[in-house]
Amino acid sequence: MSGPALRQVEPHRAIHAAMRHELQATVMAAETLSPDGDQARRLRQVVEVFLELVETRILAHAHEEEAGLYAEWLQLQIQGGREALSAAVASLVLQHSMLRQLAADVERATVVGKREAVLRGMREFQRVLDDHERHEEDLVRELLEIGGG
């Protein structure tokens, strides 16, 4: 079972907002650093912070959603015959998979020293996460409105 905060619009939105704020700060920090000298070393450090945030907060949260919240939603779909809910959950899980792949891409680009690929991957991660959060929060709100969440 997922925690109660995941099944409520405002607490879930607050979790997302905190993660989004941290992510945005690391992306902005990375974008300000040049590829030269000490700043290249600093960029690697910022990317390490980014990847740690992604692994320990964002992807851990995604796992919790998949194991708890989404499983509950699929059970609602089975009980209530809501086929659209199954498609919505599949879409959210696909977005989680995209986030995992983007994180791996950023890590690989960091290892080989491709600064622009790192920055592009970080920005794309941020974009996919923003889209995902909006979609998910809308679904939480919808389920609460119909009394199913």
Model-derived regions, located:
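Small-residue-biased structural context
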Residues: 1-149
